[in-house]
């Protein structure tokens, strides 16, 4: 049996205090639970396992998309884990959703996160995440 290896890279660039920062998302191998985030600051690699370094846990299985909702909140689709992970720009976990099947892409209007799934949906970032992000 052949093992199918898929790799997809998505990134978000953020500018904080005059520094150019890039967060690169790597989906890893399907069903291997090895998705990662790399973090670059001013053109230099800081970490290739940034989420794990900051949060002391894995990101999840097959992350697909990353989007900055506002200056204080970033959302990440973790497709095979069926979650949307919310982090702050410094990489700390803020909140996550549960049971969001087939989540692959994200869109935002700065307040809501829109996720196309099999049944169509609009997911509001968890209240505590938005409260932290707007204060």
Model-derived regions, located:
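Conserved beta-strand positions in repeat-built beta-propeller and related beta-rich domains
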Residues: 22-33, 68-69, 74-80, 114-119
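N-terminal, post-signal-peptide region of Sec/Tat-exported proteins
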Residues: 39-72
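Repeated scaffold domains used in trafficking and secretory/extracellular systems
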Residues: 58-67, 101-111
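Structural motif
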Residues: 31-38, 83-86, 121-127
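A charged, solvent-exposed segment within the mature domains of Sec-exported extracytoplasmic proteins
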Residues: 104-135
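Mid-chain, structured segments of secreted extracytoplasmic proteins
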Residues: 59-91
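Hydrophobic h-region of N-terminal signal peptides that target proteins for export
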Residues: 6-18
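A short beta-strand motif characteristic of beta-propeller blades
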Residues: 45-58, 91-98, 131-135
């Amino acid at each position: 049996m052949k093992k199918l290896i898929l790799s997809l890279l998505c990134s978000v660039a953020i500018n904080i205090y005059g520094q150019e920062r890039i967060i690169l998302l790597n989906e890893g191998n399907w069903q291997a639970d090895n998705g990662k985030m790399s973090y670059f600051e001013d053109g230099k690699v800081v970490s290739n396992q940034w989420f794990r370094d900051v949060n002391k846990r894995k990101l999840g299985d097959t992350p697909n998309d990353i989007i900055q909702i506002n200056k204080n909140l970033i959302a990440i689709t973790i497709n095979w884990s069926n979650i949307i992970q919310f982090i702050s720009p410094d990489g700390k976990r803020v909140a996550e959703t549960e049971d969001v099947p087939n989540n692959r892409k994200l869109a935002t209007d700065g307040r809501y996160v829109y996720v196309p799934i099999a049944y169509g949906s609009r997911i509001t970032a968890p209240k505590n995440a938005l409260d932290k992000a707007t204060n």
